Amino acid sequence: MKGPCKLEQLLPAPLKNKAVAVAAACLLAAGSVFGVGGAKLAAYESSTAAAFSDGMYSIAADLDARLNSAANLTTVAGKVSGVSAETIDGVNSAIGAVNAAEGPAAKAAADAQLDAAVNALYDEAVKLADTNQYDLLAGELAEFNARGNTIRNNDYNSRAQEFNDTLSGQPAKLIGALWGIEEAEYYR
């Protein structure tokens, strides 16, 4: 075997020892796996969360439009003679609960309550409404329900599932624990 090459001659004395060099290489490899892998996993977590909250095709955007339709429905129903203030207040409280909810799971639970409150208000108001009010109520309910269908068909939950599947495997599970990365919440 030939002698050491020029680069090896330039190494500090401790790194000329083969065992030290192997240990340093292992540390460098582990550092790159956990460092680069952690950064990639954190970016994946961020993009999964953004699928819920960012952009005009996100659940958050459709939920905002759904809340606007619910608020419009309360305005129209408030002009229908005989509709109880309690039923209107129920929808307004449910709107507030959706706005106050943190995270996909809490938003989904609050949205389910909003759905029930809106349908109760619509059922009460439509019986008492004149033709013009009926058309306005039906239009707002149709928009409200259309946004609900769009939310149900959104691909966020499948993206969250893919992320969670990735996070549950090795070494992602260990890297995620070191980086403080948690599973994505589902909108259910």
Model feature map: region roles:
Residues 1-188:
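A helix-centric hydrophobic-segment signal that preferentially recognizes long
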